């Protein structure tokens, strides 16, 4: 229900619970508990929650609902807004996250297997979130296609996502737009395994990555995103228009998965994303 290595039989009846700095509580009942909203049953039944302690060290995260049971999983960072019925993700501080991780690890090369993530998302007050940031990046990542590695055990995982969909404050003078940031190869360019590659041309930012402008981010409504992976292709539709269709044959040896929520790449602020819709779909023979 909460964490796979915790055995807490009375968890569903307590009003507050915590682990390693992450606390779930809803004492006044003002927050909507995501498990109680049928419109999010599809995504919750396929996902676990990966969430940081906002007061913890950079990069920290804990794992919850590994059995897809989100009963009692609600706090000021993860809840449903009772008025708008949106699934809300919040997180403070740099390189911290609050994301649903779809548990299925899938092949990207099969010609008749397609994996799709649908989302209608509004990023709330991002400029205010970054008003005091000292980062040069100033991004909020809210959708991802990442990889597990060669197998479900995580062998030879590549520590770079295939895709990040971000709100970016400023990209060479283009302000307040959504961007698709895609990895153009499967080369490891950081960490101990990336030391031999990091200074090579294939790890240069302009070679290893592409940034595709997905258009200005509205400040008063959500935006529809459809991400589909299959048949060695990554496709992204925004408000029903195809924005990206990319051959990803170079990714075929890696098992991939979806993530949705918020991942901060800015300092001294808090991100907030409202998902009016969030669904996962698999089309196979």
UniProtKB/Swiss-Prot annotation:
Gene3D superfamilies: 2.60.120.200. One of its GO terms (molecular function) is poly(beta-D-mannuronate) lyase activity. SUPFAM superfamilies: Concanavalin A-like lectins/glucanases (SSF49899). Its EC number is 4.2.2.3. It comes from the Bacteria. It catalyses: Eliminative cleavage of alginate to give oligosaccharides with 4-deoxy-alpha-L-erythro-hex-4-enuronosyl groups at their non-reducing ends and beta-D-mannuronate at their reducing end. Residues 1-20 form the signal peptide. InterPro entries: Alginate_lyase_2, ConA-like_dom_sf. Keywords: Lyase, Signal. Belongs to the polysaccharide lyase 6 family. This is Alginate lyase. It comes from Photobacterium sp. (strain ATCC 43367). The gene is alxM.
């Amino acid at each position: 229900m909460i964490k796979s290595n915790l055995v807490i039989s009375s968890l569903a009846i307590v009003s507050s619970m915590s682990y390693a700095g992450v606390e779930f509580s809803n004492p006044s009942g003002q927050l909507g508990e995501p498990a109680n909203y049928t419109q999010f049953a599809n995504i919750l039944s396929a996902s676990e929650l990966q969430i940081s302690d906002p007061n913890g060290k950079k990069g920290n995260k804990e794992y919850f609902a590994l059995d897809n049971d989100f009963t009692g999983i609600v706090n000021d960072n993860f809840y449903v807004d009772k008025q708008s019925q949106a699934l809300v993700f919040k997180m403070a501080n740099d390189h911290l996250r609050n994301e649903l991780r779809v548990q299925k690890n899938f092949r990207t090369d099969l010609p008749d297997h397609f994996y799709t993530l649908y989302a209608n998302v509004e990023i709330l007050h991002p400029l205010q979130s970054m008003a005091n940031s000292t980062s040069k990046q100033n991004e909020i990542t809210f959708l991802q296609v990442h990889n597990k590695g060669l197998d479900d055990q995580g062998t030879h995982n590549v520590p770079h996502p295939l895709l990040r969909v971000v709100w970016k404050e400023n990209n060479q003078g283009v302000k307040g737009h959504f961007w698709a940031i895609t990895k153009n190869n499967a080369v490891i360019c950081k960490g101990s395994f990336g030391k031999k590659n990091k200074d090579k041309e294939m790890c240069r930012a302009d070679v290893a990555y592409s940034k595709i402008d997905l258009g200005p981010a509205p400040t008063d409504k959500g935006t529809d995103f459809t991400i589909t992976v299959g048949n060695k292709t990554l496709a992204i539709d925004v408000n029903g228009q195809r924005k990206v269709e990319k051959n990803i044959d170079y990714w075929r040896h890696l098992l991939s998965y979806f993530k949705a929520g918020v991942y901060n790449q800015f300092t001294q602020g808090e991100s907030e994303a409202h998902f009016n819709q969030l669904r996962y779909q698999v089309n196979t023979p």
